[in-house]
């Protein structure tokens, strides 16, 4: 994209993709700029599309930028920034996973970070127990009524992730070209790249483990916002 001279020239670490060039209008708010970053780098599998899930920090000292103040009033030309994920508070009786793990809904590209484990995949429902453990809320989907409120649970033991079915509603685990495995009440190991299929709801979720990719070559073609 091309940019005018009125834009700020910035360098941004987009999660594991380091030192990327960006051009931004100084009048943009942080959420507007983050939204543009998410669109520009949508090829990153574990990068979501909801600006409020992220914040921008100054690379020099980790100071977060203020969401309500235009970026031109907070940083100058040539500034280095870091895009980071906002952590959600831990529910009681849960732990942080040992790695950054995600489920990516294959049709829309929506990314759900599993901020705790055990993590429930299903639908938020205040009337049901363990509502605070729902890390993947599929309620907004048009086929959500075919998803159980407490459908699946993902846990970790010794660095290995497992998935089990908490409901009578079927789910399948797809791995490469292997025959699909039914997910039952007996935990199955989860591997990076596995796809969890909720067949009745026509929803497929890819399991992604963020290992920390090697530093990407700096981009000399700045994205404009």
Sequence positions of predicted segments:
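Conserved positions in beta-strands of structured domains
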Residues: 122, 153-155
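Residues that act as N-cap/strand-start positions at coil-to-secondary-structure junctions
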Residues: 17, 106, 146-148, 182, ...
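Intrinsically disordered, low-complexity acidic Ser/Thr-rich regulatory segments
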Residues: 1-21, 25-26, 31, 35-143, ...
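Residue-level recognition of conserved beta-strand positions in structured domain cores
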Residues: 123, 165-166, 175, 200, ...
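Forkhead-associated
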Residues: 53-67, 151-152, 159-194
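C-terminal regulatory/effector modules of DNA-binding transcriptional regulators
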Residues: 179-203, 208-224
